[in-house]
């Protein structure tokens, strides 16, 4: 079935190509015929260009007096032949006389008048030129186009008569019957006079573009009545839209299915379950992201604000930060023993006084983190995030304190010396007491009892 449809489509496309090719050939042949007829007419009418320009000016009323005289002469001649009681012999003789006069004018008088100005016409281009009138080449082109169109119509009509004699007979009888009925209601003289008026007024209407002006004035009314081509097309478009809306919905196309693959649908129950997960639990999305080696910051949280959902309960980063608060220096000079002699000092002790404490604290935190990782197995995502957040926060604070202490080291040199003098005795006593204590066995304690008592006395 599909193969048959494909063959039909190929046959239709081939037929369309053959028709388009035949049309191109016909158009090319027609252009050649028009060019040949135009050249022939141009060779014959090139010497009559002033006369043709004058006739055009009279027909379009560029010369009103001559135009009025022409219309009067033609109307008089028409009604003379229409209302005369003369016989047909007189009319034929009068017509032959006019033909002989025209022949004498063309062959005898006109060549003598035109030979004197032959050199002038050759030197000039085309002589008289009017901006809104047609020149001889343009007249020849339109006349040739009309001649070729009529010739092709008659040739096609004869071909139609040869191939379909019955249809041609029916068509000819219908047309002649229409003319007979029209002639029965309207006299032939009136029809002939209307035809004469049409031939006289048609150039004037084209010259002033009467048809375009009438259409511009009638276009709004035609659009309101929806009889124009634009309104017809819009009405067809609206009908097509209504028809498409009335049709039942069909299955999605392949392109829509491909687009749906990039936009997966979410289940309402799964979304509600994800939203109801507590802080201690983790969704499948969090576990999958953790397995990929990245940190999941779901529900719009960050490691530093993950515990912001419950303000009454402190999170682990807050507890770890509060646990290290006693290590912070106090701004009270009495509590820290710093004499605030300089206003620029803020009472921050130098980290050089406690280098072992900072390294020891970092080492202990690292050991605690390693212990949690080793004992607790694979920790949860929340614990890892909280531990890393606390570790990074404390490291940043210690680095900030170290930088501040280095800047204020020169200003706080004298207060530190005084503080060392005040606490030197207490620190020495504390170190001495710490050195006096040793871990002894019970036997050593019993042996050293008399000496120890003597030393105490």
Curated annotation (Swiss-Prot):
Region named Disordered: 1-24, 291-351, 410-457
Record localization: Endoplasmic reticulum membrane
SUBUNIT field: Interacts with ATG8 family modifier proteins.
Organism placement in taxonomy: Eukaryota, Metazoa, Chordata, Craniata, Vertebrata
Highest taxon of source: Eukaryota
Short motif (LIR motif): ranges: 435-440
Compositionally biased spans, kind Polar residues: 291-305, 443-457
Membrane topology per record: Multi-pass membrane protein
Matches recorded under InterPro entries: RETR3_RHD (IPR055258), RETREG1/3 (IPR043384)
Predominant place of localization: endoplasmic reticulum
Biological processes per GO annotation: endoplasmic reticulum tubular network organization; reticulophagy
Gene: retreg3
Signal peptide: none
The protein, known as: Reticulophagy regulator 3
Assigned keywords, A-Z: Autophagy, Endoplasmic reticulum, Membrane, Phosphoprotein, Transmembrane, Transmembrane helix
Domain notes for this protein: The LIR motif interacts with ATG8 family proteins.
Cellular component terms (Gene Ontology): endoplasmic reticulum membrane; endoplasmic reticulum tubular network
Compositional bias annotation for Acidic residues: 428-441
Biased composition regions of type Basic and acidic residues, renumbered to the chain: 310-326
Function: Endoplasmic reticulum (ER)-anchored autophagy regulator which exists in an inactive state under basal conditions but is activated following cellular stress. When activated, induces ER fragmentation and mediates ER delivery into lysosomes through sequestration into autophagosomes via interaction with ATG8 family proteins. Promotes ER membrane curvature and ER tubulation required for subsequent ER fragmentation and engulfment into autophagosomes.
Any Pfam family hit: RHD_RETREG1-3
Family membership: Belongs to the RETREG family.
Transmembrane residue ranges: 80-100, 165-185, 186-206
Keyword set includes Lyase: no
């Amino acid at each position: 079935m599909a193969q048959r449809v494909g063959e039909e489509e190929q046959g239709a496309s081939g037929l369309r190509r053959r028709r388009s090719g035949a049309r191109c050939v016909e158009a090319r042949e027609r252009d050649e015929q028009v060019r040949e007829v135009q050249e022939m007419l141009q060779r014959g009418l090139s010497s009559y260009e002033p006369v043709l320009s004058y006739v055009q000016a009279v027909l379009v009323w560029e010369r009103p007096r001559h135009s009025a005289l022409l219309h009067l002469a033609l109307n008089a001649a028409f009604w003379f032949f229409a209302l005369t009681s003369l016989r047909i012999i007189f009319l034929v003789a009068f017509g032959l006389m006019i033909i002989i006069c025209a022949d004498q004018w063309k062959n005898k008088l006109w060549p003598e008048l035109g030979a004197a100005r032959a050199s002038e016409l050759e030197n000039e281009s085309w002589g008289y030129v009017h901006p809104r009138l047609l020149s001889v080449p343009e007249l020849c082109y339109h006349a040739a186009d009309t001649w070729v169109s009529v010739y092709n119509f008659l040739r096609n009509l004869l071909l139609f008569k040869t191939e379909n004699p019955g249809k041609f007979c029916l068509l000819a009888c219908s047309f002649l019957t229409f003319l007979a009925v029209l002639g029965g209601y309207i006299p032939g003289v009136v029809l002939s006079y209307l035809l004469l008026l049409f031939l006289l007024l048609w150039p004037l209407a084209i010259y002033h573009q009467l048809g375009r002006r009438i259409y511009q004035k009638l276009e709004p009314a035609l659009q309101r009545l929806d009889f124009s081509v634009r309104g017809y097309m819009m009405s067809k478009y609206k009908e097509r839209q209504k028809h498409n809306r009335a049709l039942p919905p069909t299955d999605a196309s392949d392109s829509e299915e491909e687009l749906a693959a990039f936009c997966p649908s979410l289940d309402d129950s799964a979304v509600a379950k994800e939203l109801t997960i507590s802080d201690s639990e983790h969704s499948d999305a969090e576990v999958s992201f953790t397995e990929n080696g990245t940190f999941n910051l779901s529900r719009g949280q960050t490691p530093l604000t993950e515990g912001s959902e419950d303000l009454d309960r402190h999170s682990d980063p807050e507890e770890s930060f509060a646990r290290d608060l006693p290590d912070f220096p106090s701004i009270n000079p009495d509590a820290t023993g710093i004499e605030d002699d300089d206003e620029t000092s803020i009472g921050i002790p130098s980290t050089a006084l406690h280098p072992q404490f900072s390294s020891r604290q970092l080492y202990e935190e690292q050991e605690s983190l390693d212990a949690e990782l080793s004992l607790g197995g694979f920790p949860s995502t929340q614990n890892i995030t909280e531990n890393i957040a606390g570790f990074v926060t404390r490291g940043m604070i210690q680095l900030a304190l170290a930088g501040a202490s280095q800047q204020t080291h020169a200003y706080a040199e004298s207060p530190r010396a005084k503080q060392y003098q005040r606490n030197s005795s207490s620190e020495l006593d504390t170190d001495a007491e710490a050195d006096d204590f040793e871990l002894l066995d019970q036997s050593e304690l019993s042996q050293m009892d008399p000496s120890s008592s003597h030393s105490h006395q």
